[in-house]
């Protein structure tokens, strides 16, 4: 469609520049380059979604400023291409209709991007809800004055985090320019004495107890017929009071013995741990060999020889302040001895209880500076009994801190180390346990020599919950991910740095736990910080009447799951006549009569099942009178697209315009022929 040029050499420079820009934006060359660039981006977005999932492509492509800019430039190009030809001729009608349709379509896409809802509603059977949770999160700060009074709420504080752990940007995923997508790092709020900084973020995480160790016991050469490799994973966590614990998490039997983990209370105890091994030359007798470590001096004695005797000074004790020992009780059922130790014959006594099989609960004498161990050699009939642990073989692993480099140079940046002590009668050995995964000898078995390796070490001075990252999983539902952010919260000059877990998306709202709500105490007020999922109220209730899940035969993989739901108003009145069924590949459309909005509901996934005894089962059924045999939750996706009708209208105009250009032009918009002039008389 030929058109005359608007810019001319005789025009003022500013006018000529504006008209030249106008002509460039309306040119076919600019449109072709822009469309080709968008085609490349759309193709790249397809690969990104295939490799990293919908959440990642929304973050890295569809919702970015540069993709919005490309679409805006396309809209400007379309508008200028049509406007520059004004006034339009009749034969340009199809061209104009097509361009109007393209602009309407782009406007509908913008409405969908800015005002659409794509969120999840988790529901238990018999429950109903109207809150749909999105993939994004926000912070909230509750400020409470000391001494009572009304609390102030700061937030929601927007937080754009992205779909990956922040440590992964620029490394494993460097082939795609994720940095062009905005993330809220650093200071995201600073007002009225409250400052919030985000230092790190995990898109998915798990919680682990600290101090704890994750070990492997086994070998790469187990013998013929076993594939050569055999490794047993062992997860152990320190238990402050193991005798009263409801769950044994600090010891486990494996490989013909027991592996025990605990935390030493001092450098002296850690050094005594290494020194307190028995000497086979002394023997063990019937009641075992007692080893006492006294300020670096090691005293070994048979319980049979010293039980019930008057207080005595072991050979090699210090001359200035000799150690006196009195072993006055032996308990065969506990495999332990009771003794008193003192400095000098008339010094104050300190009671000790030394247990052979429970060294983690042994009562030492730290005031006197004495630490003890007891070693009992048990006879077993054969290798089978040894494999069952009847020989009492054991590996003790302890966390220590502050040991000199001469003892071990293998330590964390904070100075924590791991020590181990192996007991397999009649010998024992002790040393530093490498935290980098290098093996140390473990139990000697009939077919192989086992080794012990450290896969993970989480040190801590006191019992704590540590946040650990999980690898990216594009197929994992957003509702199943545990988000976590490392933040620094400053209130009136008081700053604390910690990991904060996001509140989980679950069918029942519960108060946040200790890892999900952190409080900073300032002189005159306190600030409680939470990380909440963004939620929208869809305006009506969805009630789950029944959830059905079928498995593939012989597997635990779900082959089909569906939900039977009802739509109800806020007053409980049904909005549709009968319940509807939502299946995996058959969404349901629902128009809210109150707002006129049209929603589409998909069966996305499910949660559970949870059985009696599970933590979530007990929490969800705490108030229920009749508890079900099991609990399952259905996760429905609610989709609202405000631009759907606009996009349909734009697509319709494009079809009409193309039809007009190619099929109606010759009939309705052909140039009129001049009527033949009458012949002269």
Model-assigned labels for residue ranges:
Residues 63-138, 632-635, 639-673:
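Internal alpha-helical transmembrane segments
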Residues 671-681:
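Cytoplasmic C-terminal tails of single-pass
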Residues 32, 57-70, 96-107, 580-607:
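Amphipathic alpha-helical packing elements
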Residues 3-15, 625-626:
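Short, membrane-interfacial amphipathic segments enriched in basic
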Residues 30-90:
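Membrane-embedded alpha-helical segments of integral membrane proteins
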Residues 11-25, 83:
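Cytosolic juxtamembrane amphipathic/interface segments immediately preceding
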Residues 2-5, 9, 50, 54, ...:
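Membrane-embedded alpha-helical bundles that constitute the cytochrome b-like, heme-associated redox core
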Residues 121-635, 639:
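Soluble non-transmembrane domains of integral membrane proteins
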């Amino acid at each position: 469609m030929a058109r005359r040029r608007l810019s001319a050499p005789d025009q003022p420079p500013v006018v000529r520049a504006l008209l030249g820009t106008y002509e460039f934006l309306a040119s076919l060359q600019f449109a072709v380059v822009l469309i080709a660039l968008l085609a490349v981006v759309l193709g790249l977005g397809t690969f990104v979604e295939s490799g990293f999932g919908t959440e990642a492509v929304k973050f890295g492509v569809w919702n970015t400023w540069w993709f919005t800019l490309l679409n805006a430039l396309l809209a400007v190009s379309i508008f200028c291409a049509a406007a520059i030809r004004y006034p339009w001729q009749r034969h340009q009608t199809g061209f104009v209709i097509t361009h109007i349709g393209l602009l309407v379509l782009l406007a509908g896409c913008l409405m969908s991007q800015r005002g659409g809802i794509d969120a999840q509603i988790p529901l238990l059977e018999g429950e109903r809800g109207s809150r749909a949770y999105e993939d994004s999160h926000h912070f909230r700060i509750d400020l409470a004055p000391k001494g009572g009074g009304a609390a102030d709420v700061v937030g929601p504080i927007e937080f754009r985090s992205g779909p990956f752990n922040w440590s992964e940007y620029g490394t494993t995923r460097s082939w795609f320019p994720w940095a062009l997508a905005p993330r809220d790092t650093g200071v995201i709020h600073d007002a009225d004495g409250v400052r919030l900084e985000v230092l790190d973020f995990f898109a998915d995480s798990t919680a682990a107890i600290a101090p704890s160790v994750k070990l492997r016991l086994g070998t790469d050469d187990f013998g013929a017929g076993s594939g050569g490799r055999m490794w047993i994973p062992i997860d152990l966590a320190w238990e402050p009071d193991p005798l009263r614990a409801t769950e044994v998490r600090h010891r486990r039997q494996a490989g013909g013995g027991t592996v025990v983990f605990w935390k030493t209370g001092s450098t002296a105890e850690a050094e005594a741990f290494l020194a307190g091994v028995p000497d086979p030359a002394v023997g063990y007798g019937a009641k075992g060999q007692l080893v006492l470590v006294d300020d670096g001096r090691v005293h070994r004695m048979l319980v049979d020889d010293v039980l019930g005797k008057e207080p005595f000074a072991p050979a090699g004790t210090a001359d200035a302040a000799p150690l006196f020992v009195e072993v006055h009780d032996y308990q065969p059922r506990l495999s332990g001895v009771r003794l008193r130790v003192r400095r000098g014959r008339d010094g104050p006594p300190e009671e000790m209880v030394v247990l052979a099989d429970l060294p983690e609960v042994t009562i030492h004498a730290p005031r006197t500076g004495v630490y003890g161990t007891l070693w009992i050699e048990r006879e077993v009939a054969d290798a089978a009994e040894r494999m069952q642990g009847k020989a009492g073989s054991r590996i003790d692993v302890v966390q220590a801190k502050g040991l000199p480099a001469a003892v071990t140079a293998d330590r964390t940046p904070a100075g924590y180390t791991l020590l181990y002590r192996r007991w397999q009668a009649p010998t024992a050995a002790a040393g530093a346990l490498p935290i980098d995964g290098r093996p140390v000898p473990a139990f000697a078995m009939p077919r192989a020599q086992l080794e012990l390796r450290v896969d993970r070490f989480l040190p801590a001075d006191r019992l704590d919950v540590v946040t650990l990252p999980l690898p990216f999983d594009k197929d994992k539902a957003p509702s199943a991910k545990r988000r976590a952010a490392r933040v620094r919260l400053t209130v009136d000059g008081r700053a604390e740095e910690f990991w904060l877990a996001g509140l989980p998306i679950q069918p029942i709202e519960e108060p946040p736990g200790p890892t999900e709500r952190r409080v900073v105490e300032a002189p005159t007020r306190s600030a409680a910080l939470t990380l909440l999922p963004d939620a929208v109220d869809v305006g009506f209730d969805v009630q789950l009447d029944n959830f059905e899940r079928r498995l593939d035969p012989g597997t635990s993989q779900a082959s089909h799951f569906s939900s039977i739901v009802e739509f109800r108003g806020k007053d409980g009145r049904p909005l549709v006549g009968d319940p509807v069924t939502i299946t995996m590949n058959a969404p349901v459309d629902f128009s809210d009569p109150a707002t006129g909005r049209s929603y589409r509901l998909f069966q996305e996934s499910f949660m559970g099942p949870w059985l009696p005894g599970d933590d979530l089962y007990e929490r969800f059924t705490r108030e229920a009178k009749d508890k079900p045999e099991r609990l399952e939750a259905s996760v429905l996706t609610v989709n609202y697209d405000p631009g759907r009708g606009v996009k349909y209208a734009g697509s319709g105009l494009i079809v009409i315009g193309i039809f007009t250009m190619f099929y109606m032009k010759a009939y309705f918009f052909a140039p009129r022929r001049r009527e033949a002039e009458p012949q002269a008389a």
